[in-house]
Amino acid sequence: MKVRNPEQISIPASNTTKDPGLTHSQIIRMVNLVKKTENMNIFEELWETLRNLFRSDKHSQTAARQILKDAFYFQNCDGYSKYFTGAVDEKARDRFTHRLKKFNELKEHAKDPEMMQARGSISPDNMLCVSFYIGNIEIYTQKLQLGISPSTGGIDLSNAYLSGISLNGACLRKADLSNAEMDKISLCSSNLLGADLHGAKMNNAKVISSDLSDTNLSDTDMSDTDLDDTLLRNAKMDNTILNNAYMEDTNVRGINLSKADLSGQDSAKLRSRG
């Protein structure tokens, strides 16, 4: 998608001469369902505007349209109660999880998944913000207030759903990320000193040049994760899965790797680093 104007997303609609050219504010209005009297018309225009982001085969077009519709017409799902244990507001948790999951599902049908990004940040008062981007255009931002973990004293992200989010440069010192779902997350240049990631899933993640010293990574699945130039000093890694992880120049000083799954690693070389 080529953005002609930073104030406008204009994508030629498939099989039609209509080009809605929806503005940034109109898209936000659609997602928030402000004009409730014309929801269906708004959804149809949103779909016609965005459909060319997705592969043109019938399966992908049908699936993407339904996923977008599910995201647009939010309904509570009991399955979301297992996520974000530290969320202050349950309804906000459900909406947050729902839209992030649907965004990730949409990316699976995109012609260029890199054009669709979820960029996150964490404020000093423990507010998790995630903005959805198409290209360089921010189309929607959602926020979730989180509490303090009684076990670590840091932000409570236990059981969080953070898959696919870019949290580069985040300060997550002593964060509770136990049992979090973080597949394909990007945490490059982040500070996770003393964080608890026990039982987390981090397949295909990017954690380059980050500080994971003194973290609890026991039972964490980090298969295919890029840990290049990352500090893992004194991390606890009992039963940590590191299948095919990338660990160039990773500092593992003080780590007992005897119980870690090092499939795809040269364990002798790995133990000599740091």
Regions found by a protein language model. Name each.
Residues 7-13, 100-156, 266, 273-274:
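N-terminal capping/linker segments that flank leucine-rich repeat
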Residues 44-90:
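Low-complexity, charge- and small-residue-enriched intrinsically disordered regions
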Residues 1-30, 46, 50:
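Non-Sec secretion/translocation targeting segments of pathogen effectors
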Residues 139-274:
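Tandem repeat scaffolds
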Residues 37, 83-87, 119, 216, ...:
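Extended non-catalytic scaffold regions that mediate assembly and binding
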Residues 40-55, 171, 188-191:
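Type III/flagellar secretion export determinants
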Residues 27-41:
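Intrinsically disordered, low-complexity regulatory segments in eukaryotic proteins
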